Amino acid sequence: MEKAWRIYIRKGWNITLLKYIGNIKGVKVQIAQESMNSHVLITGMSGSGKSVRMTDIEVESIKEGKTVLVLDKDGTHYKLSKSYQNVISVLEDGLDFRLLEPIQAAESMEEKKVQVMYVADILAAGQNLGDRQICCLRTAVEYAAEHKDKDATEMYTISRCLEEQKGNSAEGVRSRLWGILNGNLLRPSAKQIEPGKINIISLAGINPKTQIQLIEIILSVVWRQLRYRQFSKVDVVCIDEIQSLSLKKNSALFELLTESRKYGISLVLATQSLSVFNKKEIAALGQTAVKLYFHPSEQDIRSIAQQIDPVAYERVAMVLKNLRKGQALTVGDIEKAGHKIGGPIVTMSQFWKEEHSKFEISNNTGGR
């Protein structure tokens, strides 16, 4: 068994990007081969079919030989046969990152400093820490790398060093990261990412603030390891309820959206409404190759229609209003049977028809 699921080298860097996004009358609709990226944005009201389509995309991805990582905040992902999915409960199983190992393996002081900054940046992801707080965190990380055997986990050692530093800055960091440092969540685990499966990282039972921190940390690990060409076990990352995550420039999610094609990773992002995002965030999300608009709320119909077609928005609004459960108005770089599709089309989820038979699914999501 692998020691940790984060450090693997992809031999030859055989990039396999996401393809399938839905179907029309049994014919698969895919992201166009010449698209600048293979990211997908899914929006729509609760119960409109977003989660089924996301699962549909996940299943098709593993059928193509890809490995999928799903960040499931509330443990409400559709349950599939064990032959398709691998569930890692962070609360029960732990999440095996072993962030300090690269620091310990550093062959020079310069490399060690780089690795310390790398780990501190991961832990600080999305926290808006000040310069003094970052300095305190780096000191704690460096100390922990040298003394981690004194505690049960790496995070406990970092927490202890922050406490021993005293002062408002160190205490502020420790307070801000309390759930991560003292929750026994990032720890050695027997559960690992399994190639060719839908790997569901369940954050169920963890308080909402710590859930968001964990997602930011996971995305930061994925992004930074991609940049160093060390993270190769995941091809597709799926995240629901993205409105809680940072989309600021230099955030992990922003970097993955804008730079990850050359590293061979695809994002599938979902949210109920785009109205909660500011203009800069919408611009970042606008870089996704394909948008799947499921039935929106009444107040969102007009704005979405105008984004899709500023001239003929009334016609688009009527299509959005009449979407049935499982249907999505699909916009972007798409093709069907190898032919590029020019305008918006309505697609359906293949998984919708098969969910009670072929994939042994049981819906525990309350109709998402």
Question: Where do the PLM segments sit?
Answer:
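C-terminal regions of RecA-like/P-loop NTPase motor modules
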Residues: 3, 277, 282-285, 293-368
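Short, solvent-exposed loop/turn segments at the edges of secondary structure
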Residues: 35-37, 196, 286-287, 323-325
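Basic- and hydrophobic-enriched, low-structure N-terminal and domain-boundary segments
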Residues: 1-45, 53-57, 97, 338-340, ...
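P-loop NTPase motor domains
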Residues: 3-9, 56-265, 269, 278-281, ...
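Conserved lysine of the Walker
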Residues: 50
